[in-house]
C-alpha cells in the first residue's frame, strides 16, 4: 500500500512540514521523519526539506512543460488480415512483396498546454488515442508518424532537440512490467537512482550513499520498503506480488527524475486505494520539484481525479476537451449532458464517448459523433481561451530562446564531468559501463546456479569425454584420437556460448526501456555484459580444458599448454561475439526466441562442417571454400593441431608390410605423412599432407581469431545501440480465412500504435444481426444452493503458522450475484480457490462446504464454472472453437453433440459475441481485446453449463469503467437467467456496486466483516456500518469506498473498532447462522431431487470426467493438431532447419568418393545431421508449455479431460510433420552425397533407399519423443532444453561416429550400447556404404619400394591376404602404392558395424521411441500431477 497516511492529510490542508534545511535524510536518526528507514518517515516533510536544501545550495530543479498545437498523428495499415496456417501462408506472399498500405489518421488536431508543475489526466476509452498521445509527447513514436504542421514547444526546446539531446527528460511509462526478475527490488531501484544521479549532490553526501537513501525514500513513498530484499520476479519466477511489481515499475520511472512524465494506464492492477496513493505522489512531485505529468487512467476514483490540474478527453482520436479538470464536468453539462447521481466525474467524462451511456438533458440537441464533439470543442469559449494561452506561451518561450539556453545549462550542471551536452545521458559512457557491471555482478550473485551448473557440467563432461582418450601415447595409433580430441575441444569451446542468445533475447525489452529512460547506452550494457562474462568464461574454459588437456595426454610442455588455453579462450570469445551479434538482427525480425535461434543453429552446422576436421581443406568444394576463410573455428582448430603436432615425432605403431623390420628402407609406416625407412613420423608432415596445415600459421591464426573477435563484438555493440527488437502490431481482429461474418465488417480504426492491451478494432454490426436472446436452456439456471460455514485456511511461513482465512461463512443462491470484497491481501482469491476446490498449494483447509447440505463430490469441480482473473486461452483457436471444446468435454456424455453445439450458439448470442465468434483469440497486442477476452473467459465456463454456480475472479480488474459496466451487465444477465454467481471485486464505483445483491466483506487476515444484502442504493449495507462508523455516509459518496474508510481499510484511515467482533455479535450474524443451519438440514430435500432426476440418464455424470477417455482423446488431439497447423512459423522453421541443414550437408559432401577419407566423410555426414537435434527439441518445447499451462491452470482443475489424454495427444501431434520432414531430409541428403550409387553398385537400391528413409523417420520420431521426455518434468522450456542438451551430449559422443567402440575403454561400452544413436549410425552406414569397393585418394596410399627383384604384389602378398587392402599396380617394381582398404565392409567392421544387423537396429530405435513415450507420461505424473489431498 502507498504510504499516504501523513501525505493525505497534509495534501488536504495544504500545509507543509516545519522541517526545513535539515539533513535531507535525517542524519540517519531513527526517530526523524526525514529518515526513510524510520517508522516516523513523512514523505511530504522529506520532499519539502529536500527542495529547500537544494535551492539553498544554489541548485535548481529542471522544470519542463509542453505546448502542442495542431497535433496530428497517423499510421499505415494493411488490408484485412486473416489467420495464417501451414497451407494459406503462401497466399500472403504477394501482399508481403507488394506494400499495399493505407494511411489511417490516429490523432486529429490536438491542442494544449501542460506547464511545469501541472498534472493532466488523459481520459478516453480503448482505441481513443490515449497511448498514442502520451507516446507523442514523450517522443516514443515507433510505428507511427507526426504531421508536418504539428507544433511542439518544450519551454523553448524544440521537439527534435528534446527527443535526441534530452531524451530522458520526457519519458513514457507503459503499463507492462519488465525487470530483471532475479534482482531484488532494492537492487533494481538503486540502479535507477545511480543512472540519473546529478553531478552536484546537496550537503556533500557521497554519491553511493545518496543513491541508496534516495532509493529508500522512493520505496517508502510507494509502500514497498518491506520488499527491499525480495526478488522482483515475473510470471514464471517467484518474487513480489503483481501489485508490488507494478509499484516497482512506477518507482523506477520516478527515479528517472524526468521533468515531463507520461504514464499510460500505470494503475492497472492496482486497486483504487493504491491508484489514489500513486496520484498523490505525483502531486507531491509536481508541487515541490516542478515536474509535470500526463496520466491516462481507467476507472479513476474521484479523489484521484481531484488531484489533477487539467484534463483532456479523447474520443476515437478526436480531442473533445482540454482544460482545467474542475471545469470539465460543467463544460459537458453545458453541452446538454447530465451526470447521474453518484457517478464520478471521470466516469461521466468517459461516458461521453459511449452513446448508450451518456444521458441527454431535456431540451438539448448535443453532439453525437466524435467529429461533432470535436467541432463543438473548437467552437467553444474554452477552446478560444486555450488558443490565447498557447499564443502567450509561444511568445514567452520561443524556440531556441533564452529559456532553452537556461535549460541546457541546467542540464549540463546535472551531467557528469566529461559528458557531452548533447548527450541525453547523465553519466559518461565508462560510468554507465561500470554501473551496468555492478548490476551484472548482482545478477550473478543473486542467481549463481547457472554458473555453478555450467562449471560443474564442464568439469563432468571433461572427465567423461577425456576418459575416452585417456593418456594417449605419442605414437601413430593416437593420430586419429588426437584429432578427435582437438576437434571436440574446439567444438565445446566454440559453442559453449550458444545459449547466450536465449538470455540476451529475454533481457532485450528491459535494455530498450531503460535506454528510453536515458539510463545508459544499450551498447554500454552489451559492453559491460561482455566484460562481466569474462571471468565466468575463464572459469568455464579452465574447468573443461585443464582436465581435458592433461587426461588425454596432449603435448605436455608449458608453452604448448598455455597456448592451448589461450587459443581455446579466444575461440570462446570469438564465437560468443558471433552469437551476440546475430542475436540483435534476429530479435529485430523474430517474434519468439525459438525463431531467433534458427540462424544460430544453421551457423553452428556451417562452422562445424568447415572447421577442417570433418572436411579437410583439400576436400572442400570450391563453391563453399569461402566459409572456411570466414570461420574462426577453422583458424582455431588449425592452430591447436599445429600446437599439438608441429616439431614432434611420433613413434610408428603399424608398418607396411606388418612383418617388416622397422627402419628397413623397404618398410613404411601405415599413416599419412610417413617416409619409407623411418620409425618415426613427423607431426609437421602428417598435418601438412592430411589437412594442408602449415606450422607457420600457428600465431597468425590466433591473430586472425582475435581480429574476428574484435570485429564481432564491435558489430554486436553497434547493433545493440541502433537495432531495436521487433515491435508487436496493434490489436486487430484476425479471422480464419473465409470465416469473416457476412453481417459484420471490421473497421480498422486507429492504430498500430495503440499496441496496448486494449482494442484498436471496432466491430460494427448490421441492424439485422443484433439480437437480444436468452435461450430456454440459459433461462433454466441452477437450482442448488452452495453454502459454507467456518471456512479456515492455515499455512506455515518459515515454520510459523499463519491463518489466511478465519471462519468465513456464506452462501450463494440461484439467481443472485454475491460480491466478495476486501483490501489487498485479505484472502479474496484464496477463499474463491478454497470454495471452488482448486487450492493446490500447501495448507490446511477446514470448515463445511456443502451443496444442498451434501459434501462436495469428485464431480464438483466440473459442475462449477471458475472464470479466473487471468484470461487464459489457446491463442490459435477461435472464439467459437474455444466454446465448443468446453461444451464437448464438460457436458455429460449422454447429451447429443448437436444439442451441445446449439447451446454454444446460445451462449454466443447471450454474450453478444456473434460479430467475432470466428475471430482468433490471438495474444495481447494481436487478437481479442481485454473486454472480448473477459467475455470469452466467462463464455467458456458457461458453455460447460455448470449446474451449480459460477465463480468469477476480478472480472473488472484493469478494465476501463465502460468495459467494466459491460462485464457486470453480462453477469447480471446470467443471474437473471437463474445462474448463481460469486464474484470478487476491487472497490467498484457506486453505480457498479449497486448491481450486486449480496456482499461478503473480508478484512486483513481473512476475517469476515459483513455478509448480507446490499439493499437498494446500498441502504442495508450503509445502515449496518453507520451503527459503529465515526461518520455517516455522505449522500453522494460511493458506499463501497465509504465502507472501507469506515473499517479503516482505505489509505490514510484507521478504525479503533474491532469490526470482526462487531459482526460476530450482531443480529445479522445470528440470522446468517440460522439460515446456514436450515440449508444444511433441509437443503437436500428441496433441491437435490430435480438434479438427481436430470442426471439418471448417465451414471458417469457423477464421475471425475463428463465424457469417456476416447471422446476426450478425439477432441483434444484435434485441437493440438489445429494448434500446430495454425502456427506456420513453428512448422516452417522446423522444416527450414531440417531442409537447409540436410541440403547443406548433402552439397558439402556432394558425390563423396569411395576413398578412405570419403568413407569417413560419409560417416561424418551422418554425424553432422545430429547437430540439429538440440534445436529441434528446443523448438517444440514452447509449444508444449503453452498447452500445458492452459491445461494445468484452467482445464485440469475444471476436470475437462484426463492428464493421460493430454500427454498422449501432445506426443502424437508432431508425428505428421516429422514424417514429412523425414522425406525432405532423406531426399536432400541421400541423393546429393551419392549414397544411392553405392546401393546401385551393390544391386540393393530399393531396399537400402527405403531403409534409409525409414531410419530418418525413426530418428525424427525419437527426436520428438525425446523432447517430450525432457520437457515432461521440467518447469520451463529453458530447463527442459538444458536437460535435453546434457543428455544429448552423452548420447551423441557415445554413438560410435567420432570414437569407435573398440577404441573406448571397457567401462564406457555400456553407454555406447545405451545410446540410441549408436544403432542409428550403424544402420545408416550399413544402408549407405556397405558392400562396395574402395579406391584410395592419391595422398592415402602408403608408398614403399620392394626389395630388389620383387614386384609390389610379391612383396606385399601376405599383407594383402592378412589385413586386406590392394596395390595400385601389382606388377610395379618400385614406388609400391598400397591402399589399406579395398572393401567398405572392412571399414565398417573396424567400427564394429555389421551389415546384417541393419534391420534389427532399426527395430531397436523404435524401442527407444516407446521408452521415451513411456518415460514422458510417467515423469509427468510423478513431477506435475498433484497427489493425495492436493489432487485437482
From Swiss-Prot:
One Pfam family it belongs to: ABC_tran
Gene Ontology cellular component list: plasma membrane
Keywords attached to this entry: ATP-binding, Cell membrane, Glycoprotein, Membrane, Nucleotide-binding, Repeat, Transmembrane, Transmembrane helix, Transport
Membrane topology summary: Multi-pass membrane protein
Comp. bias (Polar residues): 1-20
Region named Disordered: 1-36, 1076-1095
TM segment ranges: 450-470, 484-504, 530-550, 559-579, 597-617, 702-722, 1135-1155, 1166-1186, 1215-1235, 1251-1271, 1279-1299, 1317-1337, 1402-1422
Name of the protein: ABC transporter asL7
Species name: Sarocladium schorii
Amino acid at each position: 500500500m502507498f504510504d499516504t497516511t501523513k501525505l493525505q492529510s497534509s495534501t488536504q490542508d495544504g500545509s507543509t512540514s516545519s522541517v526545513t534545511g535539515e539533513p535531507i535524510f535525517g542524519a540517519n536518526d531513527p526517530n526523524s521523519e526525514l529518515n526513510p528507514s524510520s517508522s516516523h518517515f513523512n514523505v511530504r516533510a522529506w520532499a519539502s526539506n529536500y527542495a529547500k536544501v537544494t535551492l539553498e545550495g544554489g541548485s535548481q530543479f529542471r522544470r519542463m512543460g509542453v505546448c502542442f498545437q495542431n497535433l496530428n498523428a497517423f499510421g499505415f495499415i494493411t488490408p484485412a488480415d486473416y489467420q495464417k496456417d501451414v497451407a494459406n501462408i503462401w497466399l500472403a506472399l504477394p501482399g508481403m512483396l507488394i506494400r499495399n498500405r493505407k494511411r489511417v489518421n490516429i490523432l486529429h488536431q490536438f491542442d494544449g498546454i501542460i506547464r511545469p508543475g501541472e498534472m493532466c489526466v488523459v481520459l478516453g476509452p480503448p482505441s481513443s488515442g490515449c497511448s498514442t498521445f502520451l507516446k507523442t509527447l514523450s517522443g516514443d513514436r515507433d510505428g507511427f508518424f507526426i504531421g508536418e504542421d504539428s507544433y511542439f514547444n518544450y519551454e523553448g526546446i524544440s521537439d527534435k532537440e528534446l527527443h535526441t539531446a534530452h531524451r530522458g527528460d520526457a519519458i513514457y511509462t507503459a503499463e507492462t512490467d519488465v525487470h530483471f526478475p532475479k534482482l531484488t527490488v532494492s537492487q533494481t531501484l538503486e540502479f535507477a537512482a545511480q543512472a540519473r544521479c546529478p553531478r552536484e549532490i546537496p550537503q556533500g553526501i557521497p554519491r553511493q550513499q545518496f543513491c541508496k537513501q534516495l532509493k529508500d525514500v522512493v520505496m517508502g513513498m510507494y509502500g514497498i520498503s518491506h520488499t527491499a530484499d525480495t526478488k522482483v520476479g515475473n510470471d514464471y519466477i517467484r518474487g513480489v506480488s503483481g501489485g508490488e511489481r507494478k509499484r516497482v515499475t512506477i518507482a523506477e520511472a520516478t527515479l528517472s527524475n524526468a521533468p515531463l512524465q507520461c504514464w499510460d494506464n500505470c494503475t492497472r492492477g492496482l486497486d483504487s486505494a493504491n491508484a489514489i496513493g500513486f496520484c498523490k505522489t505525483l502531486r507531491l512531485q509536481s508541487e515541490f520539484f516542478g515536474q509535470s505529468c500526463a496520466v491516462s487512467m481507467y476507472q479513476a476514483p474521484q479523489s484521484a481525479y481531484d488531484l489533477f490540474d487539467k484534463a483532456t478527453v479523447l474520443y476515437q482520436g478526436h480531442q473533445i476537451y482540454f482544460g482545467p479538470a474542475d471545469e470539465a464536468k460543467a463544460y459537458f453539462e453545458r453541452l446538454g449532458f447530465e451526470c447521474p447521481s453518484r457517478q464520478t466525474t471521470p466516469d461521466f467524462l468517459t461516458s461521453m464517448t459511449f452513446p448508450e451511456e451518456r444521458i441527454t438533458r431535456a431540451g438539448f440537441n448535443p453532439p453525437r459523433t466524435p467529429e461533432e464533439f470535436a467541432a463543438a470543442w473548437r467552437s467553444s469559449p474554452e477552446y478560444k481561451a486555450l488558443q490565447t494561452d498557447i499564443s502567450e506561451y509561444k511568445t514567452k518561450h520561443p524556440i531556441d530562446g533564452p529559456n532553452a539556453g537556461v535549460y541546457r545549462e541546467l542540464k549540463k550542471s546535472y551531467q557528469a564531468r566529461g559528458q557531452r551536452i548533447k548527450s541525453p545521458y547523465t553519466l559518461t559512457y565508462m560510468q554507465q559501463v561500470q554501473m551496468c557491471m555492478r548490476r551484472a555482478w548482482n545478477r550473478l550473485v543473486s542467481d549463481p546456479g547457472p554458473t555453478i551448473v555450467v562449471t560443474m557440467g564442464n568439469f563432468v563432461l571433461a572427465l567423461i569425454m577425456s576418459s575416452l582418450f585417456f593418456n594417449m601415447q605419442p605414437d601413430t595409433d593416437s593420430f586419429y584420437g588426437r584429432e578427435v580430441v582437438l576437434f571436440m575441444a574446439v567444438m565445446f569451446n566454440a559453442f559453449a556460448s550458444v545459449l547466450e542468445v536465449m538470455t540476451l533475447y529475454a533481457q532485450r525489452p528491459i535494455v530498450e526501456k531503460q535506454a528510453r529512460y536515458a539510463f545508459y547506452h544499450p551498447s554500454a550494457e552489451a559492453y559491460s555484459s561482455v566484460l562481466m562474462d569474462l571471468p565466468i568464461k575463464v572459469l568455464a574454459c579452465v574447468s573443461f580444458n585443464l582436465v581435458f588437456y592433461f587426461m588425454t595426454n596432449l603435448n605436455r610442455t608449458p608453452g604448448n599448454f598455455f597456448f592451448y588455453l589461450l587459443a581455446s579462450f579466444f575461440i570462446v570469445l570469438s564465437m560468443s561475439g558471433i552469437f551476440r551479434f546475430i542475436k540483435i538482427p534476429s530479435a529485430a525480425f523474430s517474434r519468439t526466441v525459438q525463431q531467433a535461434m534458427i540462424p544460430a543453429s544453421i551457423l553452428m552446422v556451417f562452422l562445424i562442417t568447415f572447421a577442417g576436421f570433418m572436411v579437410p581443406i583439400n576436400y572442400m568444394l570450391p563453391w563453399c571454400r569461402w566459409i572456411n576463410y570466414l570461420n574462426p573455428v577453422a583458424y582455431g582448430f588449425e592452430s591447436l593441431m599445429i600446437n599439438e603436432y608441429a616439431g614432434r615425432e611420433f613413434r610408428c605403431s603399424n608398418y607396411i608390410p606388418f612383418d617388416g623390420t622397422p627402419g628397413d628402407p623397404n618398410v613404411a609406416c601405415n599413416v599419412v605423412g610417413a617416409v619409407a625407412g623411418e620409425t618415426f613420423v613427423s607431426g609437421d608432415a602428417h598435418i601438412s599432407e592430411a589437412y594442408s596445415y602449415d606450422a607457420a600459421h600457428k600465431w597468425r591464426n590466433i591473430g586472425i581469431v582475435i581480429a574476428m573477435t574484435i570485429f564481432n563484438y564491435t558489430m554486436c555493440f553497434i547493433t545493440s545501440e541502433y537495432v531495436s527488437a521487433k515491435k508487436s502490431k496493434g490489436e486487430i481482429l484476425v479471422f480464419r480465412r473465409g470465416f469473416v461474418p457476412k453481417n459484420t465488417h471490421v473497421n480498422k480504426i486507429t492504430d498500430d500504435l495503440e499496441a496496448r492491451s486494449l482494442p484498436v478494432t471496432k466491430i460494427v454490426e448490421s441492424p439485422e444481426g443484433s439480437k437480444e436472446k436468452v435461450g430456454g436452456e440459459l433461462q433454466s439456471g441452477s437450482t442448488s444452493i452452495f453454502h459454507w460455514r467456518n471456512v479456515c485456511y492455515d499455512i506455515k511461513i518459515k515454520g510459523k503458522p499463519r491463518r489466511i482465512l478465519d471462519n468465513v461463512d456464506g452462501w450463494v443462491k440461484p439467481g443472485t450475484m454475491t460480491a466478495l470484497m476486501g483490501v489487498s491481501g485479505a484472502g479474496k482469491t484464496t477463499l474463491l480457490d478454497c470454495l471452488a476446490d482448486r487450492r493446490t498449494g500447501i495448507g490446511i483447509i477446514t470448515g463445511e462446504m456443502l451443496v444442498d447440505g451434501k459434501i462436495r463430490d469428485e464431480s464438483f469441480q466440473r459442475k462449477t464454472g471458475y472464470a479466473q482473473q487471468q484470461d487464459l486461452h489457446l491463442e490459435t483457436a477461435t472464439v467459437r472453437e474455444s466454446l465448443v471444446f468446453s461444451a464437448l468435454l464438460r457436458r455429460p456424455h449422454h447429451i447429443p453433440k448437436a444439442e451441445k453445439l446449439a447451446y454454444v450458439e446460445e451462449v454466443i448470442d447471450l454474450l453478444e459475441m456473434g460479430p467475432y465468434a470466428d475471430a482468433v483469440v490471438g495474444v495481447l497486442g494481436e487478437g481479442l481485446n481485454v473486454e472480448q477476452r473477459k467475455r470469452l473467459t466467462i463464455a467458456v465456463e458457461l458453455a460447460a453449463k455448470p449446474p451449480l454456480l459460477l465463480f468469477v475472479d476480478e472480472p473488472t480488474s484493469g478494465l476501463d469503467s465502460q468495459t467494466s459496466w459491460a462485464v457486470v451487465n453480462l453477469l447480471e444477465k446470467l443471474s437473471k437467467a437463474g445462474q448463481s454467481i460469486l464474484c470478487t471485486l476491487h472497490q467498484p464505483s457506486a453505480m457498479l456496486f449497486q448491481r450486486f445483491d449480496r456482499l461478503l466483506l473480508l478484512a486483513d487476515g481473512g476475517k469476515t466483516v459483513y455478509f448480507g444484502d446490499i439493499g437498494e442504493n446500498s441502504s442495508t449495507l450503509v445502515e449496518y456500518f453507520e451503527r459503529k462508523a465515526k461518520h455517516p455516509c455522505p449522500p453522494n459518496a460511493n458506499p463501497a469506498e465509504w465502507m472501507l474508510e469506515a473499517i479503516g481499510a482505505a489509505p490514510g484511515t484507521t478504525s479503533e473498532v474491532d469490526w470482526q467482533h462487531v459482526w460476530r455479535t450482531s443480529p445479522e450474524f445470528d440470522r446468517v447462522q440460522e439460515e446456514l443451519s436450515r440449508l444444511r438440514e433441509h437443503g437436500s430435500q428441496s433441491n437435490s431431487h430435480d438434479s438427481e432426476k436430470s442426471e439418471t440418464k448417465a451414471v458417469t455424470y457423477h464421475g471425475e470426467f463428463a465424457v469417456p477417455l476416447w471422446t476426450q482423446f478425439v477432441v483434444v488431439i484435434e485441437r493440438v493438431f489445429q494448434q500446430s497447423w495454425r502456427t506456420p512459423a513453428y512448422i516452417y522453421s522446423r522444416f527450414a532447419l531440417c531442409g537447409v541443414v540436410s541440403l547443406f550437408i548433402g552439397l558439402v559432401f556432394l558425390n563423396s568418393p569411395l576413398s578412405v577419407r570419403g568413407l569417413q566423410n560419409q560417416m561424418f555426414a551422418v554425424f553432422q545431421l545430429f547437430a540439429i537435434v538440440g534445436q529441434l527439441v528446443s523448438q517444440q518445447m514452447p509449444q508444449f508449455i503453452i498447452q500445458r499451462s492452459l491445461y494445468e491452470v484452467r482445464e485440469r482443475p475444471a476436470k475437462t479431460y484426463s492428464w493421460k489424454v493430454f500427454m498422449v495427444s501432445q506426443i502424437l501431434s508432431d508425428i505428421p510433420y516429422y514424417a514429412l520432414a523425414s522425406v525432405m531430409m532423406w531426399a536432400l541428403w541421400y541423393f546429393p552425397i551419392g549414397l544411392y550409387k553405392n546401393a546401385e553398385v551393390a544391386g540393393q537400391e530399393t531396399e537400402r533407399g527405403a531403409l534409409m528413409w525409414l531410419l530418418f523417420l525413426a530418428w525424427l520420431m525419437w527426436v520428438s519423443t525425446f523432447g517430450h521426455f525432457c520437457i515432461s518434468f521440467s518447469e520451463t522450456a529453458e530447463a527442459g532444453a538444458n536437460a535435453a542438451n546434457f543428455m544429448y551430449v552423452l548420447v551423441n559422443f557415445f554413438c560410435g561416429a567420432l570414437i569407435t567402440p573398440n577404441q573406448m575403454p571397457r567401462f564406457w561400452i555400456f553407454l555406447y550400447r545405451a545410446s540410441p544413436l549408436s544403432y542409428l549410425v550403424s544402420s545408416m552406414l550399413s544402408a549407405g556404404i556397405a558392400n562396395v569397393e574402395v579406391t584410395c585418394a592419391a595422398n592415402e596410399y602408403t608408398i614403399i619400394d620392394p626389395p630388389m627383384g620383387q614386384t609390389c604384389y610379391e612383396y606385399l602378398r601376405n599383407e594383402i591376404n592378412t589385413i586386406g587392402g590392394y596395390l595400385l599396380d601389382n606388377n610395379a617394381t618400385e614406388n609400391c602404392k598400397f591402399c589399406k582398404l579395398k572393401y567398405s565392409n572392412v571399414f565398417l567392421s573396424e567400427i564394429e558395424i555389421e551389415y546384417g544387423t541393419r534391420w534389427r537396429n532399426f527395430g531397436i530405435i523404435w524401442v527407444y521411441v516407446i521408452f521415451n513415450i513411456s518415460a514422458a507420461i510417467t515423469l509427468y505424473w510423478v513431477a506435475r500431477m498433484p497427489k493425495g489431498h492436493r489432487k485437482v
